[in-house]
Amino acid sequence: DRLNANIVVNQPRAMVFGETAFATDIRDQEFTGTDKEYLHRFIVCAAHTTTSIDEIWFDDKLAWDGTSVQGEFVGYLDVTTCLEGTAGAAVNISARMGTSRRYTGMTYVYFRYKLTGNSKKAESPFSSSVPTRITIKGKGMPTYDPRLDSTVTGGSGAMRADDQSTWAWDDDASRNPAVQAVTALLGWRINGLLSVGKGIPPRRIDLESFITA
């Protein structure tokens, strides 16, 4: 269940299309603080870059609205989103891992939970447990649309099947099953290596057929 955050060592890499709930694959976590009052958790949402992370829900409560922490979680939760992991975006929380948590090319969220109250009378919403049912909503990967590729018969534009830097999110096209299908056939690469999808060379795909699909 992609809405239940957990650690699964053989979890397949996630490919996310359209506007939907992302994967919640816990890749690492650790406690810090004198009394281990902070829990740090890294959740990888997709094995590729994505367009946006718009909302995060814990169970049925909005925890983050795309800009700031909400409701009872204010003062007890920090959220850092990364649409494409790089060395420069790595979060350093302790000497154990330093800046080695890069999740290169992937989309991830870093959570810091404060497990203790901010005063003697206050209680953290995470004092008894940290929610595992997490809904991370957003817009998925940029897609390739042959209608916007002038090298394909019937297409017009600068998008290219063999250059994913030209792919883009579109509110209509990126939710089109035909556009999603051809993007999945092409696959997404990180540093030149196939991360998700089939990785079929464009010359072996009838791109024109996806214009009329």
What are these regions (language model features)?
Residues D1-A213:
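Polar, S/T/G-rich
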